[in-house]
Amino acid sequence: MSKRESAKYKIDRRLGENIWGRPKSPVNRREYGPGQHGQRRKGKLSDFGVQLRAKQKLKGFYGDISEKQFRKTYEEAARRKGDTGENLIGLLESRLDAVVYRAKFVPTIFAARQFINHGHVNVNGRRVNIQSYRLKVGDVVEVREKSKQLAIVLEAVQLAERDVPDYIDVDHNKMVATYNRVPGLLDVPYAVQMEPNLVVEFYSR
C-alpha cells in the first residue's frame, strides 16, 4: 500500500472497520496472524468508550471533520425540533462535500473536500468552494464545465461499490445533482452501522 493510500485509510485502521465500504481498505484482510506483532485482545469498552467510538466513526466518515465543527453541528441538531440523532444525520448529509461524494462525482469524501476547495463545483449556478456549505432541499449541485473530464470524475462515475441514494437525483451525463430531501438515518447508505443516538449520549453527559 502506498503512502497516500495508507494515509487515506488511517481512519479505517484506527476504528478497525471499513467505514466507507472500500474494497482496498486494509481492514478487509488480516495483516497478521493472531497474537503476532504484539497484538492484544481488546477488552470490553465502557459506556463512555462505546459513545466515543460512535462519535469518532460518524465524524470520521465525513472526512474526519474537526471536533469544533462536529460539535457545532450537533448543537444545531439539538436545537431543532424532533429527534436530535436524526437531525444530526440530516445536517451532515446536507453538507456540500457529502452530496458531491454521494452523487459519485468523486470517489471519496476526502476527494470531495479537495474538489470543492479547488473550485470545481457550482451550487445553483454559482461557484462554491466551502466544504461545509449547507444545502437546502431543491438546491442543484453541478461539476463545472471545465472539470467534467477530469480523471477523478470519470473514475468515480464508474464505481460499482456504491449507489446514489434516492434523496439525490443525479444526471451523470450532465454531471448535475439535485438535493431532493433531508434524509433520516435509515435512508443513508452507510457501509457500517452508525449510531447517532450514542453520539447524543456522548454530548449529553
UniProtKB/Swiss-Prot annotation:
SMART domains, per database record: Ribosomal_S4, S4
One GO BP annotation of this record: ribosomal small subunit biogenesis
Record carries keyword Ribonucleoprotein: yes
Residue ranges, annotated region (Disordered): 19-45
InterPro entries attached to this UniProt entry: Ribosomal_uS4, Ribosomal_uS4_bac-type, Ribosomal_uS4_CS, Ribosomal_uS4_N, S4_RNA-bd, S4_RNA-bd_sf
GO CC annotation, single: small ribosomal subunit
Pfam families: Ribosomal_S4, S4
Keywords noted in UniProt: Ribonucleoprotein, Ribosomal protein, RNA-binding, rRNA-binding
PROSITE patterns reported in the protein's UniProt record: RIBOSOMAL_S4 (PS00632), S4 (PS50889)
GO molecular-function terms, A-Z: rRNA binding; structural constituent of ribosome
Residue stretches in coiled coil: none
Domain S4 RNA-binding residue range list: 94-157
Task of the protein: One of the primary rRNA binding proteins, it binds directly to 16S rRNA where it nucleates assembly of the body of the 30S subunit.
Protein family (similarity comment): Belongs to the universal ribosomal protein uS4 family.
Entries under NCBIfam families matching the protein: PRK05327.1 (NF003717), rpsD_bact (TIGR01017)
Assembly, per entry: Part of the 30S ribosomal subunit. Contacts protein S5. The interaction surface between S4 and S5 is involved in control of translational fidelity.
Name of the molecule in the record: Small ribosomal subunit protein uS4
